[in-house]
Amino acid sequence: MLTLQIFEAFAIILCVYFLWSRRRFYIMMLKLPGPMGFPFIGLAFEYIRLKRKIRLRTILFKIYGKTVLTWIGLTPVLVTCEPKILEDIFTSPNCSNRSSVVDKAISSCLGLGLLTLKNNHWNERRKLLLPSFKNNAVLSFVPVLNNEANFLVTLLAEFVDGGDINLLPELNKWSFKIAAQITMGDEVRNQANYQNGNLLESYKALNNLIPIGVVMPWLRNKYLGKLFSYEKRRLEAATQSNAFIKDIIDKKLSSTDNSSEPALIDRILNLVRIGELSYDDVMGEFSNIIFAASDTLSITVNNVLILMAMFPKYQDNVFEELAEVFPSGGEFEASHADLEKLVKLDRVLHETMRLIPAVPLLIRQTSHSIQLSNGFYIPEGVTLMIDIFHTHRNKDIWGPQANAFNPDNFLPENKRARPPYSYLPFSKGKKTCLGWKLSLISAKLALAKILRNYMLSTTFLYKDLRFIDNTTMKLAEQPLLAVKRRI
């Protein structure tokens, strides 16, 4: 009996200590609007019940306003789509790190890289990698981009007048080929698991496992992960991707042949040779780059094609511009100077990234307390959800028709009139995506060749699009497109 009483007293003391140590969170909860959700799990169950649909945050913002405090598990989460609050977050040195839960989920699948490094380690790594993404380096990849875009032109010829199709699987293959070749060099084309598609399947598996590891972090426990087969799937996919990268690195380090096309690996391995980076550093970095680049590019191009099919007036406007710059059509070569002339295509691309951003959500964590411009005090240890999707549809910024497709939103005069943190397709501040310029050039070049040669249509309505959170944006139902050849 005495033992039981001692145990109960000890449990009460622990509980009181736990609550007292988190008092700053509960004080914040009294000042900021938002739901608590269920005990211990917060809104995690509701998020899973809705199958990760973005609609949950739409409901929260409608009820509680543009900045909401809620809970996932025992973690307080501040969700916002207010540009001024986003500016506070992006410009604060105390909000530069991702949530530790997200970092662990990513690094367990991809290894350590710019996606997960923190503070000084991140600063040093970015400084080392930045020259590889400068303008001249990016433009050196245009021949590779032209070749792979021509592959798309040839591929789509097979679908002409062949009924409605889902283009995303083919675009996934195309974007993965670009990411792998630009990162690892043209030698990847000789790799068996690259040719047979197994490598792409491995990265797709990792893309699905990362958000599961974020929402259900207990699955990263070795024993629980095995029990629910999470660990088996993670290990299989990570092993295959790592083996591919290791094989290419080893061949590059032992080779004296410099005749291949330029690739990031050649520049970055020079940092290994002079001792600036370790072998493990580049293993993780290459995995991070391939993962981040391939999925976002295919999603963006696919979404542009979908919206062009839904809005034929804008598709015709873009075609007229393309026909003027590229009179011949077919498998033409496009230079960077050519792409700079495509202002209508550029507006369509940016409007698509506004309405359907490839990355709908960024997650940070306060390393020290900060005070927001609205006067609210956010203590250390709070998870910050930067809701890009709803920021891009914020009616206070984009007007009453914020949800409508309108490329004129990106006319020069309209861009100048908006707050700087209202459009975030590649993040913002010092953690802006390193490859943003390469991504835009890749997308514009592929879109130019597709839309110059083909006309797309669909019976799927814009209002019926439904969006799902993932590492990258997913559509609940993929619209099917019909392809016709342009004369």
From Swiss-Prot:
Its cofactor is heme. It comes from Drosophila melanogaster (Fruit fly). Heme binds at residue 433. It is an enzyme of class 1 (oxidoreductase). It is a peripheral membrane protein. InterPro entries: Cyt_P450, Cyt_P450_CS, Cyt_P450_E_grp-I, Cyt_P450_sf, Cytochrome_P450_Monoox. This is Probable cytochrome P450 313a5. Keywords: Endoplasmic reticulum, Heme, Iron, Membrane, Metal-binding, Microsome, Monooxygenase, Oxidoreductase, Phosphoprotein. GO terms for molecular function: heme binding; iron ion binding; monooxygenase activity; oxidoreductase activity, acting on paired donors, with incorporation or reduction of molecular oxygen. One of its GO terms (cellular component) is endoplasmic reticulum membrane. The modification Phosphotyrosine is found at residue 223.
